[in-house]
């Protein structure tokens, strides 16, 4: 008697790459899903240990929250669901593995803090014990493990010259199971959901809108106003938070800048 093996579940773990286009791990997962019929689980974890790190503040997590809401709207329109869980990563993946032993995890390689480095070491050990493949894609041209910089510039230029990835999100292989997630505590969710008009809003759409306005007209007096705390507010790109949290890719900005001349 032949026992059927359930299809492998591909987990796309979003961290500081909160966008749905020019996203290599997501593009890979969707391509595999289309080719082999594997379901795809988009995932973001609000990790209490990471949130408590002094490098972060509530304004960072509010930006993340807004970015996730924008992603959720787009995914739901395509029949998918972004699974957002309030969990330490090891605890979540232990629970997921117990329910779905056949998984693959794809993400960007995070260049972050000591706490994320330690988290990644624990996760690698967990995945190795369960013979789970965790594929980490290089992020923003960062080249890990190289012993010299002689070819760094050439490789970076090659990466930036590659076409930005456009992913068709309308396919039938999204995995949706909200029972796997722990809801963000109500008091935290309420604070993060509270708008703050004095801060830049998170989201892929806002990043591209800001880039377009900079390339169209705001750049005109950049060289004059860069040193002025008041004037630089409008003359600078103001893309820092969008690049930091991955609402837009470095390649998208680089190519848009080159196209604008």
Regions found by a protein language model. Name each.
Residues 162-261:
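Catalytic cores of enzymes that engage adenine nucleotides and/or redox cofactors via long glycine-rich
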């Amino acid at each position: 008697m032949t026992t059927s093996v359930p299809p492998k579940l591909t987990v796309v773990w979003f961290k500081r790459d909160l966008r749905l286009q020019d996203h290599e791990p997501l593009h890979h997962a969707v391509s595999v899903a289309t080719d082999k019929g594997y379901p795809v689980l988009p995932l973001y974890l609000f990790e209490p240990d990471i949130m408590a790190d002094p490098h972060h503040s509530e304004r960072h997590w509010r930006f993340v929250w807004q970015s996730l809401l924008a992603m959720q709207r787009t995914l739901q329109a395509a029949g998918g669901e972004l699974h957002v869980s309030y969990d330490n990563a090891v605890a979540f993946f232990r629970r997921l593995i117990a329910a779905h032993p056949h998984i693959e995890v794809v993400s960007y390689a995070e260049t972050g803090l000591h706490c994320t480095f330690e988290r990644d070491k624990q996760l690698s050990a967990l995945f190795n014990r369960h013979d789970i493949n965790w594929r980490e894609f290089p992020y923003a041209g960062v080249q890990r493990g190289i012993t010299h910089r002689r070819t760094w510039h050439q490789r970076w230029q090659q990466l930036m010259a590659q076409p930005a990835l456009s992913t068709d999100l309308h396919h039938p292989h999204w995995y949706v199971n909200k029972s796997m997630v722990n809801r963000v505590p109500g008091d935290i969710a309420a604070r993060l959901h509270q708008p703050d008009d004095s801060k830049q809003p998170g989201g892929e759409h806002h990043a591209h809108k800001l880039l377009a306005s900079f390339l169209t007209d705001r750049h005109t007096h950049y060289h004059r106003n860069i040193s002025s705390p008041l004037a630089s507010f409008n003359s600078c790109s103001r893309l820092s938070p969008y690049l930091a949290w991955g609402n837009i890719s470095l390649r998208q900005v680089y190519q848009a800048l080159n196209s604008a001349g």
